[in-house]
Amino acid sequence: MIGRLNHVAIAVPNALKAAEIYRACGAEVSAAVPLPEHGVITVFVTLPNTKIEFIEPLGDASPIAKFVEKNADGGIHHVCYEVEDILAAREQLKASGARVLGDGEPKIGAHGKPVLFFHPKDFSGALVEIEQV
C-alpha cells in the first residue's frame, strides 16, 4: 500500500533562505510557492532519490506558525509517502487504528495531488502525509 518516500518536510522561518545551501551543492531548487489554502509557502529541493520540502508559515494563522515559533531554526515537520489509491490507503490505515487529521477527506497538496495527514501519535511521533500518485 505505502509506496516510496516522496519528501521530507522541514518547517523553517524562511524557505528560500533554507534551500540556498542545497542550491550551493548543485541541487535543483524550486521557486517559492504560496499555498494560502494550507497556510504555508513551499520550496522544493529535488534530489536524485527524493525531495525536501521547506515550508514557511504564511501569516500568523498558519498551522505551522507555532511549530516554527518553538523551533526557531526549523525542524522536521512531516514525511510524505506515495500511495496508488488514497481512499483505500485511508481506510486501511484507519482500520489499523491510525487517526486521520482534519475532516478526513483528501485535500489538494503542493503537487496538485490529493493528500491526507495522520496523527503523529500513531506513527511513533512522526506526522505522516500520504499523497496519491
Language model regions located:
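Conserved active-site tyrosine of GNAT-family acetyltransferases
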Residues: 18-23, 93
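Interaction-mediating elements
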Residues: 2, 21, 28, 32, ...
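Short loop/beta submotifs within extracellular cysteine-rich repeat domains
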Residues: 17-20, 28, 52, 62-63, ...
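A cross-kingdom feature marking solvent-exposed beta-strand/loop segments within repeated
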Residues: 5-6, 25, 30-39, 59-71, ...
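Short, charged/polar surface micro-motifs in flexible loops or helix N-caps
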Residues: 48-52, 59-61, 86
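Vicinal oxygen chelate
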Residues: 4-13, 34, 43-53, 65-133
